[in-house]
UniProtKB/Swiss-Prot annotation:
<keyword id="KW-0899">Viral immunoevasion</keyword>
<feature type="zinc finger region">
    <location>
        <begin position="103"/>
        <end position="139"/>
    </location>
</feature>
<dbReference type="GO" id="GO:0039648">
    <property type="term" value="P:symbiont-mediated perturbation of host ubiquitin-like protein modification"/>
</dbReference>
<keyword id="KW-1048">Host nucleus</keyword>
<comment type="subunit">
    <text>Forms homodimers. Interacts with ubiquitin-protein ligase UBE3A/E6-AP; this interaction stimulates UBE3A ubiquitin activity. Interacts with host TP53 and EP300; this interaction inhibits TP53 activity.</text>
</comment>
<dbReference type="GO" id="GO:0003677">
    <property type="term" value="F:DNA binding"/>
</dbReference>
<dbReference type="GO" id="GO:0006351">
    <property type="term" value="P:DNA-templated transcription"/>
</dbReference>
<dbReference type="GO" id="GO:0030430">
    <property type="term" value="C:host cell cytoplasm"/>
</dbReference>
<feature type="zinc finger region">
    <location>
        <begin position="30"/>
        <end position="66"/>
    </location>
</feature>
<dbReference type="GO" id="GO:0039502">
    <property type="term" value="P:symbiont-mediated suppression of host type I interferon-mediated signaling pathway"/>
</dbReference>
<keyword id="KW-1090">Inhibition of host innate immune response by virus</keyword>
<keyword id="KW-0863">Zinc-finger</keyword>
<dbReference type="Pfam" id="PF00518">
    <property type="entry name" value="E6"/>
</dbReference>
<dbReference type="InterPro" id="IPR038575">
    <property type="entry name" value="E6_sf"/>
</dbReference>
<dbReference type="GO" id="GO:0052170">
    <property type="term" value="P:symbiont-mediated suppression of host innate immune response"/>
</dbReference>
<dbReference type="InterPro" id="IPR001334">
    <property type="entry name" value="E6"/>
</dbReference>
<keyword id="KW-0805">Transcription regulation</keyword>
Length: 154
């Protein structure tokens, strides 16, 4: 892939469109460890709607191990407080379904069902710096199976 190819792309889908390649054939390095992402990691990065990072006109993504590790670092460094849905709505001025909330473990955007799950189960969302996080159903289940679920982390 040339350095100029797709230099305005924000997502892997846009990058592939602009460079005229398919997602499974994309070879992209991790911004943190510089390893080449496996096909499954490329697909997971795209599915999670994460953004491409540009350095010196080259695109980077993040491998699964680094996403998990740096996600945990972000939790520890930037945790502000935990709050229930009404507080999130009051603070943002949006309904909980309109607020962009990502999973604090896998980083995918929470679906309306996943946000509703927090409300029904009376579980708090987490304020990290300027963004809100919670748990997707997949990560929620993994945390519950391990018995690690707490109000501040999994």
């Amino acid at each position: 892939m040339s350095a100029r190819c797709g230099s305005t792309a924000r997502t892997l889908f846009e990058l592939c469109d602009q460079c005229n390649i398919t997602l499974p054939t994309l070879q992209i390095n991790c911004i943190f460890c510089n390893s080449i992402l496996q096909t499954a990691e490329v697909l997971a990065f795209a599915f999670r709607e994460l953004y491409v990072v540009w350095r010196n006109d080259f695109p980077f993504a993040a491998c699964v191990k680094c996403l998990e590790f740096y996600g945990k670092v972000n939790q520890y460094r930037n945790f502000r407080y935990a709050a229930y849905a009404p507080t999130v709505e009051e603070e943002t001025g949006l309904t909980i379904l309109e607020v962009r909330i990502r999973c604090c473990k896998c980083h995918k955007p929470l679906s309306p069902v996943e946000k509703t799950n927090h409300i029904v189960k009376k579980t708090q969302f987490f304020k990290l710096q300027d963004s809100w996080t919670g748990y997707c159903l997949h990560c929620w289940k993994k945390c519950m199976e391990k018995g690690q679920r707490s109000e501040t982390s999994c």
